[in-house]
């Protein structure tokens, strides 16, 4: 064998070995990459929408009819009047509630909404911005059954007393149905004040 033939064989063997090593390394890293669970997305909430109206009278009538059937719903104005029956941290967390509404004849859809950009409308007022961002994080924590922590400065001077009161209720309440109502009310107050 000549030196030239030996170099060609060595190069070919190197290419083949390199391809095998690259293939196996690629497969091992492909299998170890974390699977992103959509319920772990930060800043999103899921809302069970029962209806949507262009006028407040239709929304109020719907709310009255729902209350007569034993459901507490919130009217949230965001360009149109949305009627929400529940709020959750994932679509799965709303599945049982959705079934109970559908059993009473309501047609429901689940809406996904990103919350963390809501305070951007008041970014010039740092104190209010921090308050509302903390409220959003506390609402998300409440939906995740995590601890709600309210800064001491807001006990002295809350930006929005109604929202602050709702969050302090969420911080201590044990009744799950009242907690669900307070969570939906907190969402309504956030949208009402930030959009």
Give each language-model segment a name.
Residues 1-195:
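Acidic/polar low-complexity segments and flexible, solvent-exposed patches
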């Amino acid at each position: 064998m000549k030196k030239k033939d030996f170099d060609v064989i060595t190069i070919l063997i190197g290419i083949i070995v390199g391809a095998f090593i690259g293939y196996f390394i690629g497969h091992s890293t492909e299998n170890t990459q974390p699977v992103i669970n959509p319920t772990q997305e930060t800043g999103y909430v899921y809302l069970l929408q029962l209806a949507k109206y262009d006028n407040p009278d239709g929304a109020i009538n719907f709310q009255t009819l729902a209350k007569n059937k034993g459901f507490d719903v919130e009217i949230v104005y965001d360009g149109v009047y949305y009627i929400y029956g529940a709020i959750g941290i994932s679509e799965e967390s709303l599945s049982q509630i959705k079934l109970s509404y559908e059993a009473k004849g309501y047609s429901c859809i689940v809406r996904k909404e990103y919350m963390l950009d809501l305070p951007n409308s008041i970014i010039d007022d740092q104190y209010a911005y921090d308050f509302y961002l903390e409220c959003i994080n506390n609402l998300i924590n409440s939906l995740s059954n995590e601890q709600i922590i309210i800064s001491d400065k807001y006990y002295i001077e809350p930006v929005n007393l109604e929202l602050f009161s709702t969050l302090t209720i969420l911080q201590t309440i044990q009744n799950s149905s009242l907690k669900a109502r307070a969570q939906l009310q907190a969402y309504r107050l956030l949208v009402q004040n930030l959009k």
